[in-house]
Every structure is written in structure tokens, then in C-alpha cells.
């Protein structure tokens, strides 16, 4: 199959698609603006998934604040034309309920070995009575299902991100092998470094390297 690069055009002017040649390690052919956005503004963070007979375009829109959202469109060709999901936004936030996840948007999809679909996305959790997300941008996950019309929907219904989601069934935990660590010593560091005054810092850095090797 072919490979493509998909990205936002500067200043949110659309979604650009161009073919990528993995052997030459470069872009080839003409770049095309395949989608201008849904009109909600700040269209960015695009992903394209070839699922069944459609190419699904997943986007972040609305900005990264409380109007953040996930929208979708689809086409039978990667080059478009793309039709907007009539149920957009697929995911957003209930800004009138501060106890819920806020700023939900900028998502990605994963399908498990059992064919279950999940969406990972950015969000914020402001303390009750505040609109300041002191932990910054966090990551959440939602279980998804496909409706009869072939559009992706939250398994819990609606379009608001939930604190908890249904776990995947029958998936075994994957344990990553533990690689043997390396002990770093003086010989691993370039100690010939001069300070801002031009003085050689060899002795000082040697002491630092010696300390690191003992930790």
C-alpha cells in the first residue's frame, strides 16, 4: 500500500494530504487541501484511518480551551471529497457541569485485538468552583462504538467525556521486557567544557561525573 502525510495547514486553513515515499524518504506528488474544517474553527490535529470502504478524517476543533472538541468526516477516497459527520462533535465537554471532564479534544483511535474501539484524547480537570486546570493538559480514554450509519459514537451515549469508561474484555496484559540498565562513568561524558568566562571546567565536570556514576 501507499503511505501519506496528513497535517494542518498554517493558520488553520485546512487539512493537507500528500503521498510519502518510504524508500526515498521524501514527499512525492502534489499536496492537496482535502478539508477546510466544519466551521467550528481552529481545525488541527488530523488523523486519517482507512476503515472498511471509507477514509475517516479525525480532527481537533474549537481551540484548546473549553470549546475543544473532536470532529469527524469521511470519504471513499483519501483525496476527498469528505462529508462531515452529521453528529459532530463526536466528543466535547459539558461546560455547564464543572464536575465533568473539560477541554476534551485532540484525539486518536485504537482498535483492540477483539475489535473494540477506544478513543484517547486530551482533557482538563479543573477543581470544583474553578476554571483553572492546575494539572495542565491530561489524557483520558473513552470506549467507542460504530452506529448503523457507519459513524463513530461514544459507547456511553451523548458526546461528553466521562471520568470512567468500560474496560476491554479478554485482553491480556502485555509486559514489556526490562532492559539492563547502563552505569555511566567519567568516560561517558565530554568533560572539556569551558564556562562563560572561558575557564576550563574539566575538574568540576569530573567531580560531577564521578558523583553520577555512584548514584
Residue ranges with predicted function:
Residues 1-215:
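Carbohydrate-active catalytic/glycan-binding domains of CAZyme proteins
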Amino acid at each position: 500500500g501507499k503511505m501519506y502525510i496528513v497535517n494542518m495547514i498554517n493558520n488553520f486553513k485546512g487539512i493537507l494530504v500528500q503521498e510519502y515515499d518510504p524508500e526515498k524518504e521524501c514527499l512525492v506528488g502534489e499536496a492537496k487541501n482535502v478539508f477546510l474544517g466544519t466551521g467550528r474553527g481552529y481545525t488541527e490535529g488530523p488523523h486519517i484511518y482507512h476503515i472498511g470502504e471509507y477514509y475517516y478524517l479525525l480532527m481537533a476543533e474549537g481551540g484548546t480551551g473549553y470549546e475543544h472538541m473532536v470532529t469527524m468526516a469521511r470519504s471513499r477516497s483519501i483525496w476527498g471529497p469528505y462529508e462531515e459527520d452529521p453528529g459532530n462533535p463526536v466528543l466535547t465537554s459539558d461546560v455547564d457541569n464543572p464536575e465533568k471532564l473539560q477541554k476534551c479534544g485532540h484525539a486518536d483511535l485504537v482498535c483492540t485485538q477483539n475489535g473494540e474501539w477506544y478513543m484517547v484524547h486530551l482533557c482538563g480537570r479543573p477543581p470544583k468552583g474553578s476554571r483553572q486546570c492546575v494539572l495542565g493538559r491530561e489524557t483520558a480514554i473513552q470506549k467507542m462504538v460504530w452506529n448503523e450509519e457507519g459513524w463513530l459514537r461514544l459507547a456511553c451515549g451523548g458526546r461528553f467525556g466521562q471520568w470512567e469508561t468500560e474496560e476491554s474484555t479478554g485482553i491480556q496484559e502485555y509486559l514489556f521486557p526490562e532492559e539492563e540498565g547502563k552505569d555511566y562513568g567519567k568516560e561517558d561524558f565530554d568533560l572539556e567544557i569551558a564556562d562563560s568566562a572561558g575557564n576550563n571546567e574539566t575538574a568540576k565536570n569530573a567531580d560531577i561525573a564521578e558523583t553520577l556514576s555512584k548514584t
